[in-house]
Amino acid sequence: GFGCPGDAYQCSEHCRALGGGRTGGYCAGPWYLGHPTCTCSF
């Protein structure tokens, strides 16, 4: 979701918009699904 899989930039922007000290995000989850989960990083 939120750009994943395939658009890590959109995921990162989504995480930054959430605030709370989040610096961005990356696509995570099962590799065979193309990393479908947007995971925020702090």
Swiss-Prot record:
GO biological process, one term: immune system process
Stretch list, region Interaction site with membranes lipids: 31-35
Localisation per UniProt entry: Secreted; Target cell membrane
One GO molecular-function entry: lipid binding
Family matches, as SUPFAM superfamilies: Scorpion toxin-like (SSF57095)
Temperature impact on function: Has the lowest denaturation temperature of 56.5 degrees Celsius at pH 7. Binding to DPC micelles does not affect the thermal stability in alpkaline pH. Has the lowest denaturation temperature of 71.7 degrees Celsius at pH 2. Binding to DPC micelles strongly increases the thermal stability in acidic pH.
Similarity section: Belongs to the invertebrate defensin family.
Function: Antimicrobial peptide that acts against Gram-positive bacteria but not against Gram-negative bacteria. It selectively inhibits peptidoglycan biosynthesis through complex formation with the cell wall precursor lipid II (1:1 molar ratio) thus inhibiting cell wall synthesis. It does not disrupt cell membranes. In vivo, is effective against an intraperitoneal infection with S.pneumoniae. In vitro, it shows very low hemolytic and cytolytic activities.
Protein name per UniProt: Fungal defensin eurocin
